[in-house]
Every structure is written in structure tokens, then in C-alpha cells.
Design a protein with these regions (language model features):
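A structural signal for the main folded, soluble domain(s) of proteins
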Residues: 192, 196, 204-205, 265
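Beta-strand/loop substructures that line and gate deep hydrophobic ligand-binding cavities in soluble
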Residues: 253-306
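A short, structured loop/turn motif at beta-sheet edges
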Residues: 181, 209, 243-247, 271-279
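Amphipathic alpha-helical segments
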Residues: 178-197
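A conserved amphipathic terminal alpha-helix motif
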Residues: 296-324
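Histone-fold recognition with a strong bias for associated Lys/Arg-rich disordered tails
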Residues: 1-178, 183
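Glycine-rich portal/gate segments that line the openings of hydrophobic small-molecule binding cavities
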Residues: 205-261, 318-321
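A short gly/proline-enriched turn/hairpin at secondary-structure junctions
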Residues: 48-49, 195-201
């Protein structure tokens, strides 16, 4: 994977998590502390480094809140900060990085750095304001400790690139979820929770169910309230629970029963406990259509790669968000 592609994917992933964290505090501008929180949640080795130091998302959030209160007190402002709310990033607009935070992302691909989350974390450890050093002090460690652990990391491996088989396109990725494996398994195996992680499912009819198949419906609006336009034959979805093996495996199959123009989509989840939560490996396969549509689809490999990555990214981010 090129440095540019790795940086683009890392930047997208960290930006989403950071701005979600900022939205909990009613902010529209993500700063260094939100970038740090995003790194704690990262599925890349940088996140593992922080979590192995005992830095969970709950502890990191408390440290950020304490630091904000200390900063206000140093200015002579004696006030109680409002409690953070739920994540509302997807329902609102107007988010951006503060310049010093975006500069960290840019510098992570320069001077021999590879654009990974580990590179971002390394740059963040040397930011000059002292904010991150103070957060780490509250969390019982130092920038030097973090850098020492980063120095021991193996080079990052490629991931998320789709493989084209005879009848499908298959993509895979991993995500970190800050919750116990049993809780994550229950979430993924529950048909009522499918709309919380599947972008193509807005609701599920749980009535008259045989227990392994349900009818779902595509979303009619986006989280921000804007309507979604979709042809009638693509409204309904058939959801099949293909496999459940507690507590480490769940597989779903989605089809469109009212049209032959859309192939089946199978999404498999493999769960494993890890420090601070659960690692979820996600594999999605898109069934290929036959005939002239299949021939026309052959040149669209870059588009297929992007579709695979963005779909896997959305699913992984949604699962993590459900437990934050």
C-alpha cells in the first residue's frame, strides 16, 4: 500500500472518530485531544500501543475532561463543564480540524513516515503545546514511553483490498470495538440491531419471523434528516442469519427480493478479545451479476475497490460507535 493511500485511509478513519468525539462535547472543531481519543480507538497498532499502556477510551475521556477543567481554572474560571452527550456527528454539520491537529496528520507522511496511525501517534508525541504530554501524565505514562513502544512495532500490513473471485468481489478489514466480546456478539447477532451497523438497512420487520430470516427496508432518510431517493424495487431487503457461533462468529446475507438487478451481499464477522475490548474482522462479499452487466463491470475495478473499502469502513465505524 502506498504512503498516500495509507495516509488517506488513516486520515479518514481518525477524522471520523475524532469528530464524533468532539460532537459529544457539543463542539464543531476537533483538536489534538480528539485526535488522541481517535488513536485510542484505532484498530491499527497505534491503538494497541495505547491500550496496552492501560489507556482505555473511558480513561482517556476522563483525562481530557479533567484537563479542560484545569485549563479553565488556570484562567480564573470556576465552572462545572456540562456532561458530554451522545455522538451527533452524523446528524449535524460544520465540522473541521483545528490547524494544529490537521498539521499532525500532514506531518505523518513526511520525513520518512508512512502515513499510518503509528506515524500520526509518533508526531503527536512531539507536539509543542504540552497538551498531550499532560494527558499522558494523567494517564500514568509519558510520550517517551509511547515512542519506545512505537519503535518496537513491525511494519504495517496491507488490508481491506478486495479480491475478485469467479462469482463475487470480497473485501475484508478489521475494527476495534471498546466493549466485551459477548456484548459485541449479542449486538451483531440481533436482527433488531442490523440498522445500527448496515448502511443499506433502515429498519427491520421482526413480526412473523421464522427466526433466521427477516424483511428489512432501506433507509428513507439520512441521519441528518435529508431524504434518500431509491427506486421502489430496491426498498425491500431480505435478511438471513447464516451463522451464529457464540461468542466469536456471526454471518448475514442480504438480498433484494423485488429485483434481479442486485446480487447477494454476505457479511461475516469474526470476533476475538483484545486489550480494552474486541477486535472484529469483517469480510463482505458482493455477488456478481451475469451477462452483459458482468462484462461492463470488468473495467470498474478501482470503483469496486473503493466500494469495498468505504462499505467496510462504514460498517466498522458503526459497530464501534454503537458502544461509545
Amino acid at each position: 500500500m502506498s504512503t498516500f493511500v495509507r495516509l488517506a485511509q488513516t486520515s479518514q478513519t481518525l477524522s471520523l472518530a475524532a469528530m464524533e468525539e468532539a460532537s459529544r462535547q457539543g463542539l464543531r472543531q476537533a483538536d489534538l485531544e480528539h485526535l488522541f481519543l481517535a488513536l485510542v480507538l484505532s484498530d491499527q497498532p497505534a491503538g494497541e500501543v495505547l491500550r496496552e499502556l492501560g489507556i482505555t477510551i473511558d480513561r482517556a475521556r476522563r483525562a481530557v475532561d479533567e484537563q479542560h477543567a484545569t485549563q479553565l481554572a488556570s484562567l480564573g474560571i470556576d465552572t462545572t463543564l456540562p456532561e458530554p452527550g451522545r455522538i451527533v456527528f452524523h446528524e449535524t454539520a460544520g465540522y473541521e480540524w483545528r490547524r494544529r491537529a490537521s498539521d499532525v496528520l500532514v506531518r505523518a507522511s513526511r520525513r520518512g513516515l508512512d502515513g499510518s496511525a503509528a506515524a500520526v501517534l509518533r508526531v503527536l508525541m512531539s507536539e509543542p503545546s504540552g497538551l498531550i504530554a499532560e494527558l499522558l501524565r494523567r494517564l500514568g505514562t509519558t510520550p517517551a514511553d509511547v515512542v519506545d513502544r512505537l519503535d518496537r512495532l513491525a511494519p504495517p500490513a496491507d488490508g481491506g483490498r478486495p479480491v475478485r473471485g469467479n462469482e463475487s468481489i470480497v473485501g475484508s478489514s478489521e475494527t476495534f470495538v471498546p466493549a466485551p466480546i459477548e456484548d459485541v456478539w449479542e449486538f451483531l447477532a440481533d436482527p433488531a440491531r442490523v440498522p445500527d451497523w448496515a448502511p443499506s438497512i433502515g429498519s427491520v420487520d421482526l413480526a412473523d419471523s421464522a427466526g433466521t430470516a427477516w424483511i428489512g427496508y432501506a433507509p428513507t432518510s439520512r441521519p441528518d434528516g435529508k431524504p434518500v431517493r431509491l427506486r421502489a424495487e430496491f426498498r425491500r431487503r431480505r435478511l438471513e442469519l447464516l451463522e451464529t457461533r457464540r461468542p466469536d462468529r456471526v454471518a448475514w446475507r442480504f438480498t433484494s427480493p423485488d429485483t434481479a438487478k442486485s446480487g447477494p451481499i454476505v457479511t461475516e464477522f469474526a470476533l476475538a478479545p483484545t486489550t480494552g475490548g474486541t477486535r472484529v474482522a469483517i469480510t463482505t462479499s458482493w455477488g456478481r451479476r451475469h451477462g452483459w452487466r458482468r462484462v461492463l463491470g470488468l473495467p470498474l475495478r478501482p470503483a469496486a475497490r473503493f466500494l469495498a473499502w468505504i462499505t467496510l469502513f462504514q460498517i466498522g465505524a458503526a459497530i464501534s460507535r454503537a458502544f461509545r
